[in-house]
Amino acid sequence: TKKWSATDKDAQYQNMIDMFFDSDSPENIDVKEYDYPTTAHGYDAYNAPYMYHMPLSGGMCPTSDFMQLFDGFDRYADGSIRVTDGTNCGNGHYLLYDSPMGIFANVEPRLRAWVIYPGDTHRGDVQDIKMGTYVGNTPISPFFDDYSYATSQKTFQQTNAYTQKPKLLYMSPNSGSAQEKVTLDDGTTINASGTDGPFYSNGEATLTGIYVRKYLNPDPSSLIGEGKCAQNFILMRYAEVLLNMAEAAVEM
């Protein structure tokens, strides 16, 4: 029997992941089945975090618009996810957390089953997802004060924090030897952009700071590669039909 608890967020998150892979559930209406090596696919090869690229990765990058559909985030008046203590993301000071997953602490667990958070685990590995590392003092003012479409071509590597000497913001154009290194106060040296990016000159890592989790095989022993993945895709479930009907009734 599967474990589920209304008060245990980890159990709810794991239960939903298990549901994605339960091809024998009596709720299933339409399941697309695969079998390695004859009828395999490459979903993990195209969408897994960058540390597993075989040879591709990060093809599906969930956006903030998608995450805003889930309850539990602190929000601005316009409904967008709050990242500063100001009235919008361009003023005030950045909110600080003890870990990258802190911003997701109160979010409904099903989002965690859909996407991989920075600092969360997949296939038994901690996913070191970060665009850069800031070494300046706190509080931290927003790097941009205008996030409108008109200024969308301005990048973080054009900000004063990155261009000044000594710089306060470290970012990497690519993985491997292209990584900028940051030495922490305790003497530890880390990669500025982690193992999974985003990297500002490599589009194969996530472009949004989030990776998809749904249907990625969590088994560390499973194969990753084009034509090597064999997990089934549950295209329709009975519960989904009921929820769609309820949503349609509300929206009519």
Where are these regions (language model features)?
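Active-site beta-strand/loop architecture of penicillin-binding DD-peptidases
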Residues: 183, 187-237
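Extended, hydrophobic/aromatic-rich amphipathic alpha-helical segments that build helical scaffolds
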Residues: 1, 30, 107, 111-116, ...
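An aromatic- and glycine-enriched ligand-binding surface/loop that stacks and positions planar moieties
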Residues: 1-180
